[in-house]
């Protein structure tokens, strides 16, 4: 039976030979990332646009949204789309919130609870199945988390925990801790589960906000990194790793950080390969053309 167990929010100081040190060291270059390569810029940005749609679809899929890619693309291509279904609006809200973050949050800016609540309000706005009766307001009752043995804290303690979280991310720790703080803050938010619904979508938006806050150049190349891509690839692993961190042990929290930051590193490597025209032609475009040709032959 799910149960609540308090544990303090604090930094990790991994051993020098920890995998966490390795992944943090490799990711530090993201602060000064400048994309370049042999892929023509228009082609690269078109591909990134496609990935943005896939990432929004992936974020919604984690929450159980089963909209197909074809339906989502069709809704985006319509000049004057008909009234969006609840599931399509859910993804449109995510994209709108991502743009809001990029326009209204700058490196070094302090995070506020008001900003977090604003993200939540945008995420659930106009939704029925995955909406919230009180957009932007902390929950007033108990909630349970799907596939989790962790029971979030009582509603009366949510403001205290969220105030603590905001203070933690804004505290001027040495920059070497920034990436670790991004991962820890993601888990802590999920652990608190401050809203009645939409917590998963909101925390992934918060993670993107924190990367910008700490000066990581995630907006380069048309949003080079969206944390959603990390978590939507394997929903079961996402919940399993959250479960490890829920225990509050140093080992569990460190394993969570390695999972999150390792996923970011993998996504950056994928983007880097897209800037290589030879890789793009040989491994993506040519294979896609071959599959399309085979389908055409089969249809005949």
State the predicted function of each range:
Residues 1-300:
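FIC/Doc superfamily catalytic core
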């Amino acid at each position: 039976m799910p149960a609540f167990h308090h544990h303090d929010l604090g930094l990790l100081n991994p051993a020098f030979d920890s995998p966490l040190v390795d992944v943090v060291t490799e990711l530090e270059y993201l602060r000064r990332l400048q994309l370049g390569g042999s892929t023509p810029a228009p082609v690269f940005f078109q591909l990134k646009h496609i990935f943005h749609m896939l990432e929004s679809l992936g974020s919604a899929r984690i929450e159980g949204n089963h909209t197909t890619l074809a339906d989502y693309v069709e809704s985006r291509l319509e000049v004057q789309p008909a009234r969006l279904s609840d599931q399509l609006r859910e993804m449109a809200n995510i994209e709108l919130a991502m743009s809001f973050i990029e326009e209204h949050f700058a490196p070094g800016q302090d995070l506020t609870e008001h900003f977090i609540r604003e993200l939540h309000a945008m995420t659930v706005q106009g939704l029925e199945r995955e909406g919230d009766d009180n957009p932007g307001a902390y929950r007033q009752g108990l909630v349970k988390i799907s596939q989790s043995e962790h029971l979030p804290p009582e509603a009366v303690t949510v403001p205290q925990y969220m105030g603590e979280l905001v203070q933690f991310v804004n505290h001027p720790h040495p920059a070497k801790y920034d990436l670790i703080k991004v991962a820890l803050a993601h888990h802590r938010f999920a652990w608190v589960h401050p809203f009645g619904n939409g917590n998963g979508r909101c925390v992934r938006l918060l993670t993107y906000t924190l990367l910008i806050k700490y000066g990581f150049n995630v907006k380069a190349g048309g949003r080079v990194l969206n944390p959603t891509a990390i978590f939507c690839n394997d929903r079961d692993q996402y919940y399993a790793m959250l479960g490890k961190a829920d225990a509050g042990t140093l080992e569990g929290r460190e394993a969570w950080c390695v999972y999150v930051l390792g996923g970011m590193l993998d996504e950056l490597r994928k983007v880097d390969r897209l800037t290589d025209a030879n890789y793009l032609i040989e491994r993506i475009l040519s294979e896609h053309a071959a599959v399309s040709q085979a389908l055409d032959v089969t249809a005949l």
